């Protein structure tokens, strides 16, 4: 009997000793705040962590899951513009402003940032409370929640010191959350900052290849060469991501590719985007401002309707709009009414030319001190010396009418957006990487890698044609098939029904309700056709092209949407030692 009790005691002691030396798994939440061009939105992720004695804690990258997207709140550009309206005075975009004097109003900028950040915090807490079980809540609160707030093209071209100052304030607000809910949010200057266009594209590239399981440490991808050196091939796919204010093109290069000396490729390991243990890859990553859905719409109207070929007697004939559709001559946001008329929002901030017109100001040092930047603005019919209202105005134009001529639409999209004579304004970053326009990307560099196109507008264009059986359900990027389908769709006429306006397709292919989301869909189709033609004209062509919103897991459920959000998490957590120092050694306790 004593021997039995002795063995029980030994076993109990051994169990406790094993607990001291074995690894422990727990869950950690991540908050990625997408400060995009139109709004700011929280994305809450959950991942499994493993803590091992003497090795620290690391994240299992395959466990990262989006648990919910948050609500849309005020964009950072609005926060900055409202602060400038108040302290620089109305119409600051049209006159000289002494930026140095505005430093005295930094406390007021801090106050202005508090409200949107409070709303984001409350929204995030509501998601965590509703989506986590009790055990997960305990673990998430104990580990703290890394927060990564990144701005993309929405404030990328915002001049002076205002943007960077705002980010100092945002980091302070994140690091000082309300104590009431018990969640400990924390961040640092590496995680919360404006990201460049190239970074946005590279993070989207990492997201795509991680979720589709092309990116990893798979031994099957590696071999030992004749010199005893480990060589790993990559099976990576490229991505074309089109947002609201910019478009990113990223693809891997074949081994041995020779590029012009002016073109800069990015090595994922050398630039510390991925650790050395991952297969090495050189990629092209370029981002173009003014090629997002909203920004390109404003610039396209400004240029098209300033051209005498399309502007006659105050009427601009737009080949990218349906026959029977008309609107007032403005780049403001359009609402299609039930009676078929189009109401254009006259609010300056709702004008899709506003960001570009703000940039193209003689009061912006990027314009006043750099002649080439001023030339680019003037090439696009924007005179930097004029007041903001005039920079946004389309001269001598009162009405825009659709003509539904898709071939002419493609030619204008090509000449205005894809292959302009001069680089589109605010594209210093793209030019510095060796590309002044989209057509140059595939002329100077190309790849046989698969290409995935993502972005709401691009997906809507393809899915609309599939819905009307104008494209095959398995459409894989044949440019002439797409051009023929779009040509038929865009020749449709707007008809007013009792329940509202519809697009009446030719050849008895049915009807589709006309609304504020699809009235200018043909411009997006034309952009897609132009893009595919340039891909096909390159020295190498993609093995296939697909349009995707998200990547599904083995259970068929989406793992996460494509975009840069998962990529920015991976970029940080895969460097385990650095991540351990920032997230666990310092962590939220750094701010105590």
Curated annotation (Swiss-Prot):
Q: Which GO terms describe its molecular function?
A: nucleoside diphosphate phosphatase activity; ribonucleoside triphosphate phosphatase activity
Q: Which CDD domains match?
A: ASKHA_NBD_TgNTPase-like
Q: Where are the transmembrane segments?
A: none
**Is the keyword Hydrolase assigned to this protein?**
yes
In the record, biological process GO terms are:
nucleoside diphosphate catabolic process
Q: Decide whether keyword Nuclease is in the record.
A: no
Alphabetical UniProt keywords = Hydrolase
Q: Name one GO cellular component term.
A: extracellular region
The record's catalysed reaction(s) read:
a ribonucleoside 5'-triphosphate + H2O = a ribonucleoside 5'-diphosphate + phosphate + H(+)
Q: Which residues form the active site?
A: 200
Q: What is its EC number?
A: 3.6.1.15
Similarity comment text for this entry: Belongs to the GDA1/CD39 NTPase family.
Write down the PANTHER family for this protein, in alphabetical order. Answer: ADENOSINE/GUANOSINE DIPHOSPHATASE (PTHR11782), GUANOSINE-DIPHOSPHATASE (PTHR11782:SF83)
| Protein's name in the database | Putative nucleoside-triphosphatase
């Amino acid at each position: 009997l004593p021997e039995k009790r002795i063995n029980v005691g030994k076993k109990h002691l051994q169990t406790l000793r094993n607990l001291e030396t074995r690894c422990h798994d727990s869950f950690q939440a991540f908050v990625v705040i997408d400060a995009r061009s139109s709004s700011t939105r929280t994305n809450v992720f959950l991942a499994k962590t493993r803590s091992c004695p003497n090795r620290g804690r690391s994240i299992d990258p395959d466990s990262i899951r989006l648990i919910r997207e948050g609500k849309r709140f005020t964009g950072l550009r609005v926060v900055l513009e409202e602060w400038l309206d108040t302290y620089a005075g109305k119409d600051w975009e049209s006159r000289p402003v002494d930026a140095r004097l505005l430093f005295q109003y930094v406390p007021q900028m801090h106050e202005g940032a508090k409200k949107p950040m409070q709303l984001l915090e409350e929204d995030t807490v509501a998601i965590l409370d509703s989506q986590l079980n009790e055990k997960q809540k305990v673990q998430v609160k104990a580990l703290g929640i890394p927060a990564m707030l990144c701005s993309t093209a929405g404030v990328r071209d915002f001049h002076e010191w205002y943007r960077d100052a705002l980010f100092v304030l945002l980091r302070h607000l994140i690091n000082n959350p309300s104590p009431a809910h018990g969640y400990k949010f924390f961040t640092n200057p590496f995680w919360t900052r404006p990201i460049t266009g190239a970074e946005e594209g590279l993070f989207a590239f990492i997201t795509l290849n991680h979720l589709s399981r092309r990116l990893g440490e798979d031994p099957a991808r590696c071999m030992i060469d004749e010199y005893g050196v480990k060589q790993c091939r990559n099976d990576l796919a490229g991505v074309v991501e089109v947002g609201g204010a910019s478009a990113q093109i990223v693809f891997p290069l074949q081994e041995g590719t020779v590029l012009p000396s002016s073109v800069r490729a990015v090595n994922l390991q050398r630039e510390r985007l991925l650790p050395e243990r991952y297969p090495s890859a050189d990629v092209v990553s370029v981002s173009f401002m003014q090629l997002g859905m909203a920004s390109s719409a404003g610039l396209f109207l400004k240029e098209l309707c300033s051209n005498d070929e399309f502007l006659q007697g105050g009427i601009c004939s737009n080949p990218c709009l349906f026959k029977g559709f008309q609107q007032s001559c403005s780049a403001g946001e359009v609402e299609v009414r039930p009676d078929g008329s189009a109401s254009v929002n006259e609010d300056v901030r709702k004008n899709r030319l506003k960001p570009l017109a703000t940039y193209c100001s003689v009061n912006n040092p990027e314009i006043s001190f750099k002649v080439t930047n001023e030339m680019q603005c003037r090439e696009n019919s924007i005179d930097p010396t004029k007041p903001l209202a005039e920079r946004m105005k389309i001269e001598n134009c009162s009405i825009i009418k659709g003509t539904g001529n898709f071939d002419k639409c493609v030619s204008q999209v090509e000449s205005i957006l894809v292959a302009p004579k001069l680089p589109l304004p605010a594209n210093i970053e793209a030019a510095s990487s060796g590309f002044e326009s989209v057509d140059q990307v595939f002329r100077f560099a190309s790849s046989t890698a698969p290409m995935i196109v993502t972005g709401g507008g691009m997906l809507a264009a393809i899915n609309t044609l599939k819905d009307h059986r104008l494209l095959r359900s398995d459409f894989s990027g044949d440019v002439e098939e797409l051009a023929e389908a779009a040509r038929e769709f865009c020749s449709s006429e707007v008809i007013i029904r009792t329940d509202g306006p519809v697009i009446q397709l030719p050849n008895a292919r049915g009807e589709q309700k006309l609304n504020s989301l699809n009235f200018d869909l043909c411009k997006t189709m034309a952009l897609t056709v132009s893009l595919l033609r340039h891909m096909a004209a390159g020295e190498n062509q993609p093995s296939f092209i697909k349009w995707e919103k998200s990547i599904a897991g083995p259970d068929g459920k989406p793992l996460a949407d494509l975009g840069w959000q998962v990529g920015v998490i991976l970029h940080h957590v895969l460097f385990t030692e650095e991540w351990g120092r920032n997230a666990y050694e310092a962590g939220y306790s750094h701010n105590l």
